[in-house]
Structure formats: C-alpha cells, structure tokens
C-alpha cells in the first residue's frame, strides 16, 4: 500500500477535476455552438445578405468564448467547494495582520533596547568608580604596612636598649660571688676561733652555758651580714 501525503492527494484531485471540467466544457461548448449555429446563425443568414454571414460567424465565435469562460469559472468554484478550508487559510486580512505585528514588535524591541543601552552606559560609568575604590583599597593596606613597620621599629629599639643591659647582670653576679666568698672566709675563721677557745676553756674550767651563747651570737651576726650586703 502506498501512502500519499495531503499535498499529493490535493494535486490529484485538482488534475481530476480539471480534466472533468475541461471535458464537460468541451462537450457543452460543442453542443451550444451547434444549437447556436442552427438557430441563430441560420435565421440571421436567411434574413441578412451574404456579407453579414461573416459578422454572424464572428458573433457566434464570440458567443462561444463567452459561454466557455463562465464554465472555467465554475471549475475554480468546484475546486473551492472541494477544499474550502485551504481557501480560507489564504486570505488578505491575515497577511495584513502578519505585516502589522512585526512592525509593532520591532518598535517594542527598539524601546526595550534603548533602556538596555542606558544601563550599559551606567555600568561603564560605574566601572571607573569601582576602579578608583579598588585603588584606594590597595593603597590602604600599604599604609597599614607602613604603620606596622613604624610600630615595629620602636619595639626593636626597646629590645636593643634592653640587650646592652644584659651583660651588666653577669658582671654584677661575678662581683657578688667574690664578695660572698670573702665574707664566707672570715666567718669560717671566726667560727673556727671560738671553737678552739671553747676547747681550751673546757679543759681548765667547765663553763658550758655562758660562752656557747656568745658563739651563737657571733654566728647570727655573721649570717646576717651577707644578707644585708
């Protein structure tokens, strides 16, 4: 089975209807010409002279043309009746509307594009301002770095001032150590001398209570001296 598209079917119908209309028109025109020639032309030829026969023949030919032309118009009508929907689709009002709509659409698009251009110009104006703001933001961290460096410099100066004081401390410690050693040596000598005196006194006379107290006093005094120094 062959499948035909609507366009092919419509073409076949057109050819068929045209052939039928042409056949009918040909037969009708032939019949009408015969009747016309038999009735009108014969009567005119009988009444008119021979010169008028040519005029009658021309009139008959013109009449045939007039009769055949309306039949051709009927052919188009029959096709319009066969496919009325397609005839309705092709109408002038639709073409007018199609032409008017794009013009309005073009005007609306132009109106829409104009504010878009204005927005683009505003953005271009804003961009240099944003660039200036970015430059200022870049300059600010540089200033902050300079301030930090200035703050760090006095701190470094303080550290440097503290560093020379450090060597004085070991010098003081070194000075304090020989002083303590010198103080410790006489204390030991003083402690050793009363012990020898106690041994010498205990042999002839036993007085354990009075003199040891004096020795304790000397020990306390000798212990207090380095603390005060």
From Swiss-Prot:
Biased segments, Acidic residues type: 195-204
UniProt feature, compositional bias: Basic and acidic residues: 109-128, 218-229
Sequence segments annotated as region (Disordered): 61-229
Biased segments, Low complexity type: 166-194
Protein name per UniProt: Uncharacterized protein 050L
Species whose genome carries this gene: Frog virus 3 (isolate Goorha)
């Amino acid at each position: 089975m062959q499948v035909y598209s609507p366009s092919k079917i419509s073409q076949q119908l057109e050819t068929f209807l045209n052939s039928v209309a042409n056949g009918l028109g040909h037969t009708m025109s032939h019949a009408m010409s015969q009747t016309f020639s038999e009735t009108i032309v014969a009567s005119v030829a009988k009444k008119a002279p021979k010169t008028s026969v040519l005029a009658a023949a021309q009139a008959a030919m013109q009449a045939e043309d007039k009769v055949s032309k309306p039949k051709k118009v009927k052919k188009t009508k029959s096709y319009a009746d066969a496919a009325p929907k397609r005839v309705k689709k092709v109408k002038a009002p639709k073409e007018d509307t199609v032409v008017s709509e794009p013009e309005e659409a073009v005007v609306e698009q132009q109106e829409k594009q104009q504010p878009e251009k204005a927005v683009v110009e505003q953005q271009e104006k804003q961009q240099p301002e944003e660039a200036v703001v970015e430059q200022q933001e870049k300059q600010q961290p540089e200033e902050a770095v300079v301030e930090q460096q200035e703050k760090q410099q006095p701190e470094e100066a303080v550290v440097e001032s503290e560093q020379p004081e450090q060597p004085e401390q070991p010098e003081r410690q070194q000075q304090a150590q020989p002083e303590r050693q010198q103080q410790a040596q006489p204390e030991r000598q003083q402690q050793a001398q009363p012990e020898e005196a106690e041994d010498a006194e205990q042999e002839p006379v036993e007085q354990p209570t009075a003199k040891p107290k004096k020795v304790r006093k000397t020990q306390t005094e000798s212990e207090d001296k380095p603390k005060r120094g």
